[in-house]
A protein has these predicted regions:
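N-terminal targeting signals for export/organelle localization
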Residues: 1-68
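Hydrophobic beta-strand anchors of alpha/beta hydrolase catalytic cores
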Residues: 90-91, 118
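Thiol/disulfide oxidoreductase modules built on the thioredoxin-like
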Residues: 136-140, 148-194
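C-type cytochrome heme c attachment motif
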Residues: 96-103, 163
Length: 198
C-alpha cells in the first residue's frame, strides 16, 4: 500500500500535502514577525531608512527623461543633464504632500543661494500642487522634472520622499540621503562632500 493510500485510509494527509498546507502559514508568520520588528524599530529609533544602502552609489544615474513642471519656467530633467555636469549637483525628489520636504526646503534654498545647482524631481504630485508648493516655500531648483507615475523614482531606487543624491562633476552618484536634508546633515555629511567633489 502506498503512503497516499495509507494516508487516505487513516484520514491523515501525506507529508508532502501537510507541508504544502503548513508552509504558507510559516512564511506569513515569518513575514509578520519581520514587519512587527521593523515597526518596533520605528518606534524606538532602531530602524532608520537612511541606513538602507543605495545600489547606485559609485555609478552613473539611470537613464530617464522628465518633462518640466508647467508654469514654472524651468527646463525638465534628464540623465543627459547629469552625464558630466562639470561641478557637483544635487538631485532632490520631493512632493507637495510630503511634510519632511517642507522641513528640508530651507536647506535646499540655502544651498541654491550658495551656488550649488539643485535639480528637482516632483514625485507623484499633481502639477498644480507642485507649483503651489514652490510658490509657498520658494524655488531652489535650476531644473525641475515631473515624475507623476513614479517610474523614474523606481529606477533610482527611491525609498520615499524626500530623497537627495549628490552627483559629482563627472556624473557619478556619490551620496544619497533618504529623509530630509537638515543643518546637521549639511554640516556633517553633505558640506564636506560638496567640498571634496568640487
Amino acid at each position: 500500500m502506498s503512503v497516499a493510500q495509507e494516508g487516505r485510509r487513516s484520514g491523515r494527509l501525506p507529508f508532502s500535502r501537510r507541508a504544502l498546507l503548513v508552509l504558507p502559514a510559516l512564511v506569513a508568520g515569518g513575514a509578520g514577525l519581520g514587519f512587527f520588528a521593523m515597526l518596533r524599530g520605528l518606534g524606538t529609533g532602531g530602524y532608520d531608512p537612511r541606513g538602507v544602502p543605495s545600489a547606485l552609489i559609485g555609478k552613473a544615474p539611470p537613464d530617464f527623461e522628465l518633462p518640466p513642471l508647467e508654469g514654472i519656467g524651468l527646463p525638465g530633467l534628464s540623465a543627459a543633464d547629469l552625464k558630466a555636469p562639470g561641478r557637483p549637483v544635487l538631485v532632490n525628489f520631493f512632493a507637495s504632500w510630503c511634510v519632511p520636504c517642507v522641513i528640508e526646503h530651507p536647506q535646499l534654498m540655502r544651498l541654491s543661494r550658495e551656488g550649488v545647482p539643485v535639480f528637482g524631481v516632483n514625485y507623484k504630485d499633481q502639477p498644480a500642487d507642485g507649483r503651489r508648493f514652490l510658490e509657498r516655500h520658494g524655488n531652489p531648483y535650476a531644473r525641475l522634472g515631473v515624475d507623476l507615475p513614479g517610474r523614474t523614482a523606481i529606477d533610482w531606487g527611491l525609498y520615499g520622499v524626500p530623497e537627495t543624491y549628490l552627483i559629482d562633476r563627472g556624473g557619478v552618484i556619490r551620496w544619497r540621503m533618504a529623509g530630509p536634508v537638515t543643518e546637521d546633515t549639511l554640516r556633517a555629511d553633505l558640506g564636506p562632500l560638496l567640498r571634496r567633489y568640487a
